Amino acid sequence: MNNFKKVVLAYSGGLDTSAIIPWLKENYHVDVVAFVADIGQSKKDLNGIEKKALQSGAIDCRVFDLKEEFIKDYVYPVLKTGSLYEGNYLLGTAIARPIIAKKQVEFASSIGAKFLCHGATGKGNDQVRFEIAYAALAPYMKVIAPWREWNLNSRESLLEYLREKNIPTSATLEKIYSRDENSLHISTEGGLLEDLWNKPNADCWNWTVELEDAPEQPEYISLIVKNGSVVSVNNEFLTPLKCIEKLNKIGSKHAIGRIDIVENRLVGIKSRGCYETPGGTIMHIALRAIEQLVFDRESFKWREKIGLEMSSVVYDGRWFTPIRKSLQASADSLSSEVNGEVVLKLYKGSVIPVQKKSSNSLYSKEYATFGEDEVYKHSDAEGFIRLFSLSSRIRAQNKLK
């Protein structure tokens, strides 16, 4: 192996990345610096993480609080676009990868490291997402992906490897699920979910209550939207992070934001996951409610196209690309009109807009009324219909010749 000097590892403190540190030292003869991105994962995952990294053999461990930036600069912009991957998934894991990779590259550059490492497996999407970002931001840096090189392909072998290296770990063979958590969502994969006929059990859900345990009475909340972003919850103006945290708390007790889906991974494998995105789900529905008021037909169709394309761009890890920037610019332009207030009814997993208003609303009661009005001439429709149906009329006439 080449004698590298310093490697910056995207470190989670879990079993995989704990084993990667001694493996890098043994196989690449390097100094390992652990980089930890705090994007809202559980505090128990972060408690003592610096000590854990050093015990595993890292020469240093740095933790960066990225929660506010993550929600403000990554989650909120994507919510504007209405992106839902394959019609269901609010991209909670995918959207977190660009900021981790970006900050990892910046940190590596600041300490003079030329080598990057991640703990993504060779079967998943994250290896692609990380390495596309690395290529876009630091093409001169070498990437080490241990899961594509080593033979430690089971939990048992990883635990045995750490024992051989006399590295303490709290991990056991009991863990059967793979989880990913940030301020937007938490995902659960593996274990009994790998058999599609198995129903998710209580262990598959972490944030939200069961539908049966949700309150018997609905809760009504008010959101204020400005330029396509939620800025206030129940008349309390908050930062993006505080908005999502408050809505996560409210939504979780009403079983909102649960999905159990089978998705198409970028690498061609279908995978099943239980995702919980309570706050993001509430925001998504609120934004679409205001859009109904302010978008004309063509604007609405265009926003839907943006959302469809953006969902693939984000899922695939193409954040640092011209197409993502172009889609975002278009969504930002449309969202400049998305201002207003919406009241939502939360009840046993459902989010129902019940009141909405906007100063930019194109809805006019005078025109829409089923009663008598003085602004709409019904006779005007005759000419419109004749022109709108002209091609159909000519086609039918041709068949009669």
Curated annotation (Swiss-Prot):
Catalytic activity: L-citrulline + L-aspartate + ATP = 2-(N(omega)-L-arginino)succinate + AMP + diphosphate + H(+)
Pathway named in the protein's UniProt entry: Amino-acid biosynthesis; L-arginine biosynthesis; L-arginine from L-ornithine and carbamoyl phosphate: step 2/3
Disulfide bonds: none
InterPro entries the record matches: Arginosuc_syn_C, Arginosuc_syn_N, Arginosuc_synth, Arginosuc_synth_CS, Arginosuc_synth_type_1_subfam, AS_cat/multimer_dom_body, Rossmann-like_a/b/a_fold
Residues the record lists as binding L-aspartate: T121, N125, D126
Keyword presence, Cytoplasm: yes
Subcellular location(s) of the protein: Cytoplasm
Catalytic activity, EC: 6.3.4.5
Residues holding ATP: A10, Y11, S12, G13, G14, L15, D16, T17, S18, A37, G119
Binding-site residues for L-citrulline, renumbered to this chain: Y89, N125, R129, S178, S187, E263, Y275
Superkingdom of origin: Bacteria
GO molecular function: argininosuccinate synthase activity; ATP binding
Protein family membership: Belongs to the argininosuccinate synthase family. Type 1 subfamily.
Protein name, UniProt field: Argininosuccinate synthase
